[in-house]
Every structure is written in C-alpha cells, then in structure tokens.
Amino acid sequence: TRAVPMTYAFDFASVLSSWPQFLEGAWMTILLSFPATVIGFVGGTLLAIGRRSDKRWLVNACGAYVEVLRNTPLLVQVFLVCFGLASLGWKVSAFSAALLSLVINVAAYSCEIMRAGMDSIHKGQIEAAECLGLTRRQVYWHVVIRPAMEKVYPALTSQFVLLMLASSITSQ
C-alpha cells in the first residue's frame, strides 16, 4: 500500500470569528480563579492551623474535611453544591455555586500544602520565639506561617494553576 500524504490546513477564520467567546471565557476564568485562590488559600491556612491544634475534635474535624474533599472529584463537589443547596431551598446563582465549589476544593488542597510547610519548621524555632515572649499569634505569623509560605510557594503555585485549569469544569 502507498502512503498518502496528509495535508491539513488550520482555518483561523473560525477562531477569529469566535474571538468574543474566547475573551468572555478567559474573563470568566479570571473571575472564578482569582477569588477562589485567595479565599481558598486563607481557608486552607486556617484549616492547617486547625489540624495542628491541641484540641482533638478540631484536628479530627479539619482532617475529615480535607480527606473527604481531596478524595472526591471536583465535578461531584460542583454537583453537590449546585443541587444540594437548591434542595435545601437556597437560591444560589451558577457563578456563586461554581465559586463556592472551587473555594472548598482549593481550601482542602491548600490545607495539606500549608500543613506540610508548617510541619517543616523546626520545633526549636517555635520554642525560641516563645522564650522571647512572643504571643501565640506572633509565633504563628512570624515564625511558622511566613517561613512555611516561602517553603511551599512552588507547590501552592502549582495548585493555583490547577485550580485555574479546573475552573473549566464549572462551565455551563
């Protein structure tokens, strides 16, 4: 048999004619991804602090949240938020449901990333800060969270890129 050469020509006219839809999609990606990243990161950091708590019930509650959300697909979470809130009688716009789904998802992943960063801080540094008279809040901010954020920056950046890509799941 003879090989037949393939000649493909991409028609950019169809892309250019759909340019407004591409721009609208890019804008919606930004509108969903940026707030979900910020709110999810703050929530994940609070969850990570909760997972390191002395209170057993708080550790278990935060751990259960993280494990459930990390072990269910994002699409299932989106369906649960959209249809679950509606079945409870709460009227939520599609945008709000999508944003809430992304926030609760990225918070669970950010929690584990931040917890790993916090656990990497040597206990001696925390004890030294306490001996210097820093309050618990000051110790967490200056000695634990800020250095942990520097250590986990690459992992957090990757997670936020994945969030931006996953925002396409929420399209209508």
Predicted segments with their positions:
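Transmembrane alpha-helices and adjacent helix-loop boundaries
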Residues: 3-172
